[in-house]
Amino acid sequence: MAGLQLMTPASSPMGPFFGLPWQQEAIHDNIYTPRKYQVELLEAALDHNTIVCLNSGSGKTFIAVLLSKELSYQIRGDFSKNTKRTVFLVNSEKQVSQQVSAVRTHTDLKVGEYSDQEKTQCWAKERWYLEFETHQVLVMTCHIFLNVLKSGNVSLSNINLLVFDECHLAIQDHPYREIMKICESCQPCPRILGLTASILNGKCDPRDLEEKIQKLEEILRSNAETATDLVVLDRYASQPCEIVLDCGPYIDKSGLYQRLLNELDEALNFLIDCNISTHSKERDSTLISKQILSDCQTVLLVLGPWCADKVAGMMVRELQKYIKHEQEELHRKFLLFTDTILRKIHALCEEHFSPASLDMKFVTPKVIKLLEILRKYKPYERQQFESVEWYNNRNQDNYVSWSDSEDDDDEDEEIEEKEKTETSFPSPFTNILCGIIFVERRYTAVVLNRLIKEAGKQDPELAYISSNFITGHGIGKNQPRNKQMEVEFRKQEEVLRKFRAHETNLLIATSIVEEGVDIPKCNLVVRFDLPSEYRSYVQSKGRARAPISNYIMLADSDKIKAFEEDLKTYKAIEKILRNKCSKSIDCGNTESEPIVDDDEIFPPYVLRQDDGSPRVTINTAIGHINRYCARLPSDPFTHLAPKCKTREFPDGLYRSTLYLPINSPLRAPIVGPPMNCGRLADRAVALICCKKLHEIGELDDHLMPVGKETVKYEEELDLHDEEETSVPGRPGSTKRRQCYPKAIPECLRNSYPKPGQPCYLYVIGMVLTTPLPDELNFRRRKLYPPEDTTRCFGILTAKPIPQIPHFPVYTRSGEVTISIELKKSGFTLNLEQLELITRLHQYIFSHILRLEKPALEFKPTVADCAYCVLPLNVVNDSGTLDIDFKFVEDIEKSEARTGIPNTQYSAESPFIFKLEDYQDAVIIPRQVIYRNFDQPHRFYVADVYTDLTPLSKFPSPEYETFAEYYKTKYNLDLTNLNQPLLDVDHTSSRLNLLTPRHLNQKGKALPLSSAEKRKAKWESLQNKQILVPELCAIHPVPASLWRKAVCLPSILYRLHCLLTAEELRAQTAIDAGVGVKSLPDDFRYPNLDFGWKRSIDSKTFISNQSSSSVESESDCRLNKTTAPDSAASSAANSVIYMQINDQMSVNCTPPCQKSLSHLQTVCFSDDYKAINGISCNGLTNGDWEAESAACFQKDERITCKQEIPEKSTSFHVQNLPKENQPILKECTLSNSDGNVSKPTSDECPSTCTSDMHYDSGLSNRHSSKTLGPNPGLILQALTLSNASDGFNLERLEMLGDSFLKHAITTYLFCTYPDAHEGRLSYMRSKKVSNCNLYRLGKKKGSPSRMVVSIFDPPVNWLPPGYIVNQDKNSDKWESNETSGEDVMVNGKIDEDFDDEEDEDLMWRNPKEETDFDDDFLEYDQEHIKFIDSMLMGSGAFVKKIPLSSFAPPDQNYEWRAPKKPPLESSQFPCDFDDFDYSSWDAMCYLDPSKAVEEDDFVVGFWNPSEENCGADAGKQSISYDLHTEQCIADKSIADCVEALLGCYLTSCGERAAQLFLCSLGLKVLPEVRKLVTNTNVISASSSYQNSTRDNCTLTARTNTDLSSCKGIDYGYLKIPPRCMFEHPDAEKTLDHLISGFENFEKKINYPFKNKAYLLQAFTHASYHYNTITDCYQRLEFLGDAILDYLITKHLYEDPRQHSPGVLTDLRSALVNNTIFASLAVKYDYHKYFKAISPELFHVIDDFVQFQLEKNEMQGMDSELRRSEEDEEKEEDIEVPKAMGDIFESLAGAIYMDSGMSLETVWHVYYPMMQPLIEKFSANVPRSPVRELLEMEPETAKFSPAERTYDGKVRVTVEVVGKGKFKGVGRSYRIAKSAAARRALRSLKANQSQVPNS
């Protein structure tokens, strides 16, 4: 037998490349890709009466249901008007309901079910008529139908389709037969479909079979069609070469074989003879023993003694377990007996051979033959095949797409990552063989594998084999599995995975692998035991599917004769079935023809006339077409293939027509030329088709299918010039950060007044609009409304300042509204006056505010941003404000101006107290008390205690009186012992007054309980700070003005930002034509506010609404009297004021606690739950419960460890040098949102801040709609959450994001009517990518205008007139010493007192003092460690700062990374997302809205040493100046662009937003060349037309406009003209195809004008009967974006004002495939769905059943699983993506049909979605993955994907210390979420058991 000739890949004439196993789904080159057999069967059944012979029941349902659906247009309508009906016949009653539910699930037809023969027998004709009238499909048993026919109740001519289930019964005497007899007499006869799965049972004679089939065909008057699963699987696939090998008998030379056999026989006989009486209940004691011994015997017979020895050894081990666990004596004895026998066998073998090495004498001839075959497959030495190509071929069936969304550009990286792990390449030796050996018994497989491995060690020829075995143990889908089987199961899947990945090249398997297991196409299949029946033969043969393969059957000599007979039978059966195979072409002959040079017959299609030019010949054309179809977009269930029909004409010529899948742009059938034979006709038509595809650009110039990156749409992808690459990180990502200068508004640039030049004087109006409510005024301080005193500040500049909205600052007295009003202009000042003013300006910033520091220099003439701040007062009785020169001069003269007057009092000239001097005073204690000579403390006098004197009792027991305290402690004698004492307050060191102190981030008030405690504290004397007037000097600046001065940094900063925003608004008006360039003089935007009022809980601070409004009105009047000229100058404005007061008086008043901006509170708002392990101790101290508890709402879990001992004093973070202060990223108000709920659609009522109801006083001509957005709203869009302001861009960004997607989608859809979804998707993802948006934003100059870090005047604010002095900067700071108690940092002494707590009471009660100096606070140990590590661990300050660390206050220091993390905490991984550096160096933050992939977010303490951005980024450092520059991540810029879009959308409507996008360079509207250049060309939509009365309107574009100069205008998108293809009888086809859809239109309450849209929305790519419209993919692409936008917009406008985090969660909960699919099923979309895809059919079937059982909607694919028990292999029920798709495509269809009306779509969809929106808004669902990662941020780790045996994906998540959890699903995402869900369930179960300690 040495001459065995096998066709091995290596020897094949086509060269070795062909048989590569990884040519898995080889694209056929000479025949069209075969379609699924069910599809072919359906086609046949539609064409003629058919008997379908199938293997499985499920396939039958598919064909029957789809056939009735296809023919349903014949049965819709009135029975009385001769409409027909469909009848399903079944054999028995119980099958009725199965059929009924199948038809009901997949169609909207009315189904009647009749199973009770008795009952129906007595029905009269009328009753039956009624049944036929009311139902369209009737399912009944055959007996009932026979009766109906016999009694003449209905005639067969009324029936269009008759389905016979189990039609093989018709051969016998059966009602089926009689029914068919009646049929014969009837004309026209209904269409007949017979279904049978049992035409082949066991062995049968081919002749009988043929007869049976013929007879059946006659009876049912049909053609039998067999499914290809009964013949070899692809009827086109090349058949394997079948070989039967006679192996000859085993010659037992040594006699060992016989001895072993005898031993086993005897033992078995003994066991059989043991006649132990077993009761039926008891188990048979000998059972296990018999089983083991007979298995051993089989191995001996089949494989020989060597293997018998091996198996005996294995069995002995297995027996030990049984013996150990066996309780019963008798059983045990039998087991021991068996054990002995096995040991004996082993001993016998050992005498003959050494078990270690394989001796060929002791194996059977079969094994030797097998090894011989395997040797033939030995590969040539190290052939390196280029198999990479295959792995990356995305349209292969087994290509796993990891990405579920096309739009995310971060996805690409991920895909690469994941693919790397998947494709472990085969070693060079596994690259040829891919084989399976089928054996019958499990043990045979195990031992044969062992033998092959052993042989490989000994025989170098076999060394290439890497084998494994798999037995059917536990692979069955539905058996219950125990733990041990589970382990088995896992192992087997691993085996299959390796075989699939070609890590092993030989699989030894039991017959289980014949069916249903997904394995690659093999090129060798060996039947070690002969197949015993046809089914087994076909199934194992069907595994040999590689293009060149061998199917070898090994036969023992004695069996070979009998088997040859069997084989003949099998062949004959196969032949009969093949003939019955639908449209079978006997392809044997075509393949065997020699390949002639057909070019002669039909010339090839050549691109260029040169030799190497790409060409398609008649022989390669079919391959090109197949490849093209495989690249069209489709889902995992559908493999698109061309359809070719060949007809023979009478003249003997053949002609083929080729139909491409319906989502190819080439829609018309292609008719080929007439040819001599069918094969050539097929090829010729393919060649013509290639030519056409190339002409329309579907094949590229290499004649390969173009990818989505197609050249054709190049213009859409004008990707900008490549980014500068010096910056590490991927453009557009969060990891890439760059520096930008901070913008300076044009009107403030170089605007320092010059002598003799005209100036503008603006007054800074300040009015207390919401006084601090009593509950918050803990110290019972008097409130000081700024309008009570006339002296105030003004701004002197050389340029006019545009009007900006009034805005609030929050002082100790409450909310103060700031206005900037022009006082006078055009006047001039002389040099002397200007110098005086300039000196005072510097004095304010350097002395009062102490903002001067070595790094800053005052050079008003050089500074970029320079204007003067100066005091104004009512001068010379005129009652108008003007510059207060007298006051300025007084200050210059005063000796207390800078230092402290050295007045000495003595007994002779004692101190004299004058009350009026102290009424409005700031006092400075004399040096003796405080050590700071250079920077003494300043105090406001809060109260004069006339009843106390220095002799009054001192509050703490150490000293008798105040006088004694000063004497003892400071050796001071007082000269006046009758003077009253002063109660003082610190002047404020908190300079960031942008947001109130007592509100948490959301504008929610802090709870009052803690307030009560504090009030008590402030009422006791002990906690007041008391000074003696004699020991203090009075400062020349009065307290009232000082209080106003403290507001200056916040006012000027806010002014600056608003002017920047206003400038952006004006710029956009020019570029985009949205809004006007300069605002009308009489117009002012409504005030800036934080939008909290509308989202406030009912629990506000003000108990009585009415009283507050009264109060505010009086404020307003007062303001009129005191400053008639300023804030309330016009009636219109006063109206605004009152309204604002009404609103503002609710609860936006600041308290008097410590500043939020310096983080005394650790706030986690609802959506940022605290995470275990952030230790808060570094952040707050004794005061912790008061403030931070206040920040947690009732329902929040606080999991911070509170290790902060209560102390009487409190350590303030303030006392750290500024840049060392820790801060919580989300600490202040970042979570709220300025623009609250302005609906974006035009007609909704406006409730938005930016358009508060101010029309009453303003003329209606102006609104943000016409003028452009409120600068306040623009500012919100420019503010990142890191800026910790009262608003940020997050909500607007989400709205902008979804509108952007919608605008671009609509544009692409309308502009490229021929592009299929894959291409549209690709173009969209490029346009909306962060990278693209970042580039556009950068081009527009957004980065400079953005507000990225917290406003901290001492650190990062440059006062007007100052410049940053670089040289001084570095010299000064490097030489500065960092030791000594009063370390100066930023020119601030570290004892910078907080305005609130009086740390330094000179006589404070010293509880267990760790006596630091008097005025240093006590720290607990934790704090000290914290501060030490902050100050010392950080090393010295140097000049550069590392990239991605936070900027220092000036650019000259850097943190050298601490050696260990500053807080004793584990090193958290740090996610640097959106972190803009500000001056905070110890950082702990969490911000889920900036989540990493899959919503994981990380909480971490920042540690610069760990930061790595790319390989070498760590080394590179960005050095920048905090005052004038800011460092921003690319992604933040992209976010800002989206937020600006959201801002234009909410203010000016959708058209304006589209124009804004166009002006950015994102084309979303078609360009129109302008012809007219006359003045006002209104380019706005009609809704603005009414505003044309007045020429300051909207987009009146004159020819001075930039855009007009370019001559470009933007038109409107046009709906693509055709949605139906030209087709001879299109209308008729359309009516057929959408028959029944009117019910659906009623259900959704929208009648389509153009029904073709409706059809298109429901047509799946696999549905080739629709020849008149496209499939739904394009509409789905459109609908997806529309629904996303509509839902996001709805959520954004929700009056509940969801925070950004909640908004994100809600959006992802509502806009996802699961929800859409569930809704689609709920509203019956699936019943109208048109698809021909068996797998999809079953998935939908399962899903619908599941939904019915569940009967309620699920969020976040939440509990989508069948049962709790199926824990181990929890597989989420699969959500058919197609269902979600048609939900979206219908939205797209309505949008197009209604003339692009979003309102119409929402009108249809809102009622469907409302219940869910309500349900989720009330209780926001989160994705399981995110929830798990929030619960276990440190310990949950997801594994990469593994493939399971049936081709699904498994993901394991390990929660360290709590277990591993697995999830399975069709994609990585589904599996991941299933795993997370199981982990959560387990963790939650454990939590509930362990009550929280």
Swiss-Prot record:
Name the positions where ATP binds: 54-61
Residue ranges of every copy of the Dicer dsRNA-binding fold domain listed in the record: 621-713
Q: Where does Mg(2+) 1 bind?
A: 1293, 1371, 1374
List the Gene3D superfamilies hit by this protein, alphabetically: 3.30.160.20, Dicer dimerisation domain, P-loop containing nucleotide triphosphate hydrolases, paz domain, Ribonuclease III domain
Question: Which stretches are tagged as biased composition: Acidic residues?
Answer: 404-416
**Segments forming domain PAZ:** 886-1036
- SUPFAM superfamilies xref list: dsRNA-binding domain-like, P-loop containing nucleoside triphosphate hydrolases, PAZ domain, RNase III domain-like
Q: So where does Mg(2+) 2 get bound? A: 1676, 1781, 1784
Q: Which GO terms describe its cellular component?
A: cytoplasm; RISC complex; RISC-loading complex
Q: Which cofactor does it need?
A: Mg(2+); Mn(2+)
Entry function: Double-stranded RNA (dsRNA) endoribonuclease playing a central role in short dsRNA-mediated post-transcriptional gene silencing. Cleaves naturally occurring long dsRNAs and short hairpin pre-microRNAs (miRNA) into fragments of twenty-one to twenty-three nucleotides with 3' overhang of two nucleotides, producing respectively short interfering RNAs (siRNA) and mature microRNAs. SiRNAs and miRNAs serve as guide to direct the RNA-induced silencing complex (RISC) to complementary RNAs to degrade them or prevent their translation.
Q: What is this protein called?
A: Endoribonuclease Dicer
Species: Xenopus tropicalis (Western clawed frog)
